[in-house]
Structures are given as structure tokens and as C-alpha cells.
Amino acid sequence: MKLLLNILIFAITLFLYIHILFHLNTSNDLEIYQLNEPTKEKLEEVCDLKQPVLWEYPNEDLLKSINRKNLLDTYGAFDIKIRKVKYDLKNNEEMYLPYSLVNGLEAIDKHKEKIYILENNSDFIEETGLYKIFKLNDSLIRPALVSNIYYDIIFGNNTETVFKYDLNYRNYFMLTEGEIKIKLSPPKGTKYLDEIKDYENFEFRSPINPWNTKKQHLSNFDKIKCLEVTLKPKNIIYIPPRWWYSIKFISKSTVASFKYRTIMNNISISPHIIKGILQNQNIKRKITNIVN
């Protein structure tokens, strides 16, 4: 009986070790894979190589639903989150502020400095019922044994997101209108990017702008290599965990984001999850009006 128990413990330990190691492993090849109408099995196989993957995903339901005109006509009064991306977040200051979709889009379009984006809009997706549309149309990209699903809609116009990486098992970004460019960098360059681990917002970002690098950051940024890819409507890209990326919005653009975690993925990143929970237990934030 004792022998069987020891064998069982060893088997469980080995199982966990192998799967956690798989989730922690990364690939650093400066290459992006392109697919042509992949099957679910083929897509899973390629994504497990931990390299960026690009293909065309002509999903008419998503293209018709996740665009400015339809969202404004149907859900213009609902609140969405706006973020000022070109400034350093001060202590106790909120990263996101709620605005109606109408006012939020007006802010990102008309502000002279083009420093706002709309993102982190899972609440908006839930309240408007768009969650059903996302869920009905992600069967190709949703992995097996999913434990957490994060849908988002990102809006931008002639600006870019911060340079950051995600820890999720799968991260997909589909362009539904406009044009964007994405700058990607493999995980091995992290030590040169002055990484900020923001556990309050569970965001892992760099103060370096890869599109317009300041002089004080050039010596470090020149040590890393980047890929740049352009997305047109219907294009979708998979960005592996721990790969750095920044999205540049060339014009008025809308991006549908799909992020997934599995149980083993959660176990592998549990130290970060625990730190995030502890960090948010006693946080007092200051609300600042960032849009004139």
C-alpha cells in the first residue's frame, strides 16, 4: 500500500513538473509563422511552438458586430474604459477611467496629442451581451480545458499601446476595421527593457516606447531585436506568453482580443497571481480626470 502511494505521489509530481515546465518554456526565434485556413488541431500544434502566428480569419459575425458604427449605434450610451498611454502612472492613480462609448471614441479621435486608447472592456462586453458573440465565434482558437476567458475590444487612432507582455496560455488579436502594426520582441530581451511588474493592474510593461525610443533608453533598446507585422481587417495574430508587443493604430481601428488560461497555466503563474491578490487587498486609488 505504501509503495502504491509513493508511486502515485511520484506520478502526480512528475505530471505537474512536466506541464509546468511546458508553460514556463519560451521560444526566442525572431520569426513569425503564417498559416492558410488552419484547422483547430493544426493551430494548436503551431501555437505550442511558442512563436507568433498570423493568418486570415474571415469571421463575418465578428466583423459585423465588433466595429465602431455598429457599437455606436447599438451601445453608444454604455460605459467603456479609457487609458492615457503616454504618461507614467502615479501612485494610487487609476489606470482606467469610465466614459460612455460615444465620449470615449470622441476623445481618442479629437484629442490633438493622440494619447488615449480604449481597452480593458470586459465589463462593457458583459453588459451589452457581446460576450455571446465572442463565445459563439471563438471555437477555432479557444484551447481545450480552459479555466479563464478574457474578451476585450480595443479602440485606437494614430497612437500605440504600451510595450508589454501577457502570461496567458493563448493571446489572440483580430483586427475588425482599420489598420494596425504590431512590434514584437522575444522574451530574452526582457533584461534590457526596464520591466515594470504592476501587480495592481496585473500588467507587465516597459517604460520604453519601441516606436519612438527616447535617447536615455536607446543603449538598452538597441540590444534587443524586434519583428514588425501589419494587420488588415480579417487578420488575426497569436502572440505567445512572455513575448513583448505594442500595437500601433495607423488609423481609426478596432481590435477584438481573445485571451485564455488553462488550469495548468494558472498553476504555472500562481506566484504572480498571488502577488496580484495581495497587492490589491489594501489599495486606495485616486481618481484623476485625464480628458479635457
Report each predicted region and the residues it spans:
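N-terminal accessory scaffold of Fe(II)-dependent oxygenases
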Residues: 1-236, 244-292
